[in-house]
Protein backbone atom coordinates (compact mmCIF):
# COMPACT_ATOMS: atom_id res chain seq x y z
CA UNK A 1 0.00 0.00 0.00
CA UNK A 2 1.33 3.46 -0.92
CA UNK A 3 2.05 6.06 1.77
CA UNK A 4 -1.04 8.04 2.68
CA UNK A 5 -3.45 5.24 1.79
CA UNK A 6 -5.71 4.04 4.56
CA UNK A 7 -7.53 1.12 2.91
CA UNK A 8 -10.93 0.64 4.53
CA UNK A 9 -10.35 2.70 7.69
CA UNK A 10 -12.46 5.85 7.38
CA UNK A 11 -11.19 7.03 10.76
CA UNK A 12 -7.59 6.89 9.52
CA UNK A 13 -8.54 8.59 6.25
CA UNK A 14 -10.20 11.38 8.24
CA UNK A 15 -7.09 11.74 10.43
CA UNK A 16 -4.79 11.85 7.41
CA UNK A 17 -6.98 14.37 5.63
CA UNK A 18 -7.37 16.70 8.62
CA UNK A 19 -3.63 16.59 9.25
CA UNK A 20 -2.49 17.29 5.69
CA UNK A 21 -5.11 19.82 4.60
CA UNK A 22 -4.16 23.52 4.61
CA UNK A 23 -5.83 25.37 7.47
CA UNK A 24 -7.90 27.57 5.16
CA UNK A 25 -9.51 24.43 3.66
CA UNK A 26 -10.01 22.95 7.15
CA UNK A 27 -12.06 25.99 8.15
CA UNK A 28 -14.00 25.99 4.88
CA UNK A 29 -14.96 22.31 5.12
CA UNK A 30 -15.90 22.57 8.78
CA UNK A 31 -18.19 25.47 7.97
CA UNK A 32 -19.75 23.37 5.21
CA UNK A 33 -20.36 20.41 7.54
CA UNK A 34 -21.12 22.09 10.88
CA UNK A 35 -22.07 25.67 10.03
CA UNK A 36 -20.17 28.85 10.85
CA UNK A 37 -21.77 29.43 14.26
CA UNK A 38 -20.87 25.98 15.59
CA UNK A 39 -17.34 26.24 14.18
CA UNK A 40 -16.95 29.65 15.84
CA UNK A 41 -18.15 28.15 19.13
CA UNK A 42 -15.63 25.29 18.88
CA UNK A 43 -12.86 27.73 17.98
CA UNK A 44 -13.72 29.89 20.98
CA UNK A 45 -14.22 33.05 18.94
CA UNK A 46 -17.08 35.48 19.45
CA UNK A 47 -18.23 35.90 15.87
CA UNK A 48 -18.86 33.49 13.02
CA UNK A 49 -17.28 36.13 10.80
CA UNK A 50 -13.86 35.20 12.23
CA UNK A 51 -14.07 31.59 11.03
CA UNK A 52 -15.45 32.79 7.68
CA UNK A 53 -12.27 34.86 7.41
CA UNK A 54 -10.14 31.80 8.23
CA UNK A 55 -11.83 30.03 5.32
CA UNK A 56 -11.87 32.81 2.75
CA UNK A 57 -9.54 35.69 3.64
CA UNK A 58 -6.28 34.08 4.76
CA UNK A 59 -6.86 35.27 8.33
CA UNK A 60 -4.87 33.25 10.86
CA UNK A 61 -6.18 32.36 14.31
CA UNK A 62 -4.91 34.63 17.06
CA UNK A 63 -4.78 31.88 19.67
CA UNK A 64 -2.50 28.88 19.03
CA UNK A 65 -5.09 26.38 20.35
CA UNK A 66 -7.63 27.19 17.63
CA UNK A 67 -5.97 25.37 14.73
CA UNK A 68 -5.57 22.02 16.57
CA UNK A 69 -9.18 22.26 17.81
CA UNK A 70 -10.50 22.80 14.31
CA UNK A 71 -8.29 20.09 12.81
CA UNK A 72 -9.62 17.59 15.34
CA UNK A 73 -13.17 18.80 14.72
CA UNK A 74 -12.69 18.24 10.98
CA UNK A 75 -11.27 14.78 11.60
CA UNK A 76 -14.32 13.78 13.60
CA UNK A 77 -16.83 15.62 11.40
CA UNK A 78 -15.51 13.93 8.24
CA UNK A 79 -15.56 10.53 9.92
CA UNK A 80 -19.15 10.88 11.12
CA UNK A 81 -20.41 12.55 7.94
CA UNK A 82 -19.12 9.62 5.87
CA UNK A 83 -21.78 7.55 7.66
CA UNK A 84 -24.51 10.09 8.43
CA UNK A 85 -25.94 13.38 7.19
CA UNK A 86 -24.61 16.84 8.01
CA UNK A 87 -27.59 17.34 10.30
CA UNK A 88 -26.73 14.21 12.29
CA UNK A 89 -23.08 15.28 12.44
CA UNK A 90 -24.10 18.71 13.75
CA UNK A 91 -26.41 17.13 16.32
CA UNK A 92 -23.62 14.80 17.45
CA UNK A 93 -21.30 17.74 18.10
CA UNK A 94 -23.94 19.70 20.03
CA UNK A 95 -25.64 16.91 21.97
CA UNK A 96 -24.92 15.63 25.46
CA UNK A 97 -22.94 12.49 24.72
CA UNK A 98 -23.14 9.52 27.12
CA UNK A 99 -19.67 8.41 25.96
CA UNK A 100 -18.37 11.78 27.20
CA UNK A 101 -20.10 11.80 30.59
CA UNK A 102 -23.04 13.69 29.10
CA UNK A 103 -20.91 16.56 27.84
CA UNK A 104 -21.09 17.86 24.28
CA UNK A 105 -18.12 17.27 21.98
CA UNK A 106 -18.28 20.92 20.87
CA UNK A 107 -17.95 22.15 24.44
CA UNK A 108 -15.08 19.79 25.19
CA UNK A 109 -13.23 20.96 22.09
CA UNK A 110 -13.78 24.59 23.06
CA UNK A 111 -12.90 24.33 26.75
CA UNK A 112 -10.64 21.31 27.09
CA UNK A 113 -6.97 20.69 26.47
CA UNK A 114 -6.79 18.98 23.10
CA UNK A 115 -4.34 16.31 24.29
CA UNK A 116 -6.77 15.37 27.07
CA UNK A 117 -10.17 15.60 25.38
CA UNK A 118 -9.08 14.65 21.86
CA UNK A 119 -8.79 10.90 22.48
CA UNK A 120 -12.13 10.89 24.33
CA UNK A 121 -13.88 12.66 21.46
CA UNK A 122 -12.38 10.36 18.82
CA UNK A 123 -13.39 7.29 20.84
CA UNK A 124 -16.93 8.64 21.23
CA UNK A 125 -17.15 9.25 17.48
CA UNK A 126 -15.99 5.69 16.75
CA UNK A 127 -18.55 4.31 19.20
CA UNK A 128 -21.29 6.40 17.57
CA UNK A 129 -20.43 5.26 14.05
CA UNK A 130 -20.12 1.60 15.02
CA UNK A 131 -23.15 1.59 17.32
CA UNK A 132 -25.34 3.92 15.29
Task: List PLM regions with ranges.
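Non-transmembrane "mature" sequence context
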Residues: 1-132
Amino acid sequence: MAPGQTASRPDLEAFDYATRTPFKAVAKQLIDILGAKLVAYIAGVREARAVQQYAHDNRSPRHPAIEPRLRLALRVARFISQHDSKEITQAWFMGLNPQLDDRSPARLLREGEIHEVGPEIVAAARAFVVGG
